[in-house]
Regions:
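Radical SAM/AdoMet-radical enzyme domain recognition
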Residues: 1-105
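Glycine-rich beta-alpha junction loops
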Residues: 81-85, 108-113, 169
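Class I S-adenosyl-L-methionine
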Residues: 90-94, 110-119
Length: 177
C-alpha cells in the first residue's frame, strides 16, 4: 500500500473491514498509508453481534477500533438497519459513535438478486427512520462525501457526521456517474 500511495494522486486510502483483526494490523495499516477505515458493524450489543456473526467476539472489534483511533486513523461505522434486529439500537449507535467522534452511516437492506434469499422481511425505510431521528436531532445537511452515495448530516447534539444510504427509498443511482 505504501508504495501505491506514493505513486498516486489519491487523497485518501480507505479500507472496509469487519474489524476483528484491526487491533493487530492498525499500526501497520497507518504506516502503509491507510487514512480511513470503514467498519461494518450492525450492532453494538454483544449477544446480537454473536448471533449475526455466528460466534464473533465484539470486544475484538471494539479493541480494533480503539487501536485504529490511537494510531490516528479515521473510522466510519457502516450499519445496515435490519427490521426486528437492530432498529431499536439506532439512537444508541448514534450516541456511541458520537462519544468516540466516529462518523456513522446507516444503510438500507438491499435485495440480493443473485441469490434465492429474500430480504424483504428485513427492510426498514431509512426515509421513515430519518424523519423520526430528525425530530430528535434536528439534522442539518452538509456538503460532505466519502466518495459514495451517502447523504451526510450533522446535529448540535452529536460530535460526528451521520450518513444515510437509501438505495430503495431514495435511489442513490440517480447521483451515479
Amino acid at each position: 500500500l505504501n508504495t501505491k500511495k506514493e505513486k498516486t494522486t489519491l487523497k485518501e486510502i480507505t479500507l472496509t473491514t469487519n474489524g476483528t483483526l484491526l487491533k493487530k494490523y492498525a499500526k501497520q495499516l497507518k504506516l502503509n498509508g491507510v487514512n480511513r477505515i470503514n467498519v461494518s458493524l450492525d450492532t453494538i450489543n454483544p449477544e446480537k453481534y454473536n448471533k449475526i456473526t455466528r460466534f464473533g467476539n465484539i470486544e475484538k472489534v471494539f479493541d480494533g477500533i480503539n487501536e485504529a483511533l490511537d494510531n490516528n486513523i479515521k473510522i466510519k461505522i457502516n450499519t445496515v438497519v435490519i427490521k426486528d434486529f437492530n432498529e431499536n439500537e439506532i439512537e444508541e449507535l448514534i450516541n456511541w459513535t458520537s462519544n468516540k467522534k466516529i462518523d456513522l452511516t446507516f444503510i438500507e437492506v438491499m435485495p440480493m438478486e443473485e441469490t434465492d434469499i429474500s430480504r424483504e422481511y428485513q427492510f426498514i425505510s431509512l426515509s421513515d427512520t430519518f424523519s423520526k431521528l430528525d425530530k430528535i436531532y434536528n439534522f442539518s445537511k452538509i456538503d460532505y462525501s466519502t466518495g459514495g452515495p451517502a447523504r451526510f448530516y450533522t446535529s448540535d447534539l452529536v460530535s460526528n457526521k451521520i450518513g444515510f444510504i437509501s438505495p430503495l427509498t431514495n435511489n442513490f443511482c440517480a447521483s451515479c456517474n
